[in-house]
């Protein structure tokens, strides 16, 4: 059985980011009432699978759970920015960044997450690749002290734990 154009768009999004949740698809691809049926059809077609609410592309075999969680957290922040009409679209990036988000003013914002215990190496990578417009996502407020390692300026620092509580950026 064939897949529809909208299902193909959903599948393309899941292939691109490897992991997402239904809310991410609703925000970036398809906010129609049929989105859940489209996702279910892709599962039935064995194009994607869902485990604990996380939608994964069928081609992903050896899941790195830390990397999966990073992708989901960055997409959570991007989805909130899109809901607030602060960004228009997103596209994938190479490390150390996860996505580039196009703002309403046609500027690009480069988003990455800094993991606990890896601050020194990840911040050094961000410093080396920082072109401006960088949004750093910290897992929690204990990581703030590491920001002094940066030699370049970042546009915004978001603490994910706080974001989860109040959905404010």
Predicted features by range, described:
Residues 4, 16, 27, 56, ...:
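Residue-identity detector for threonine
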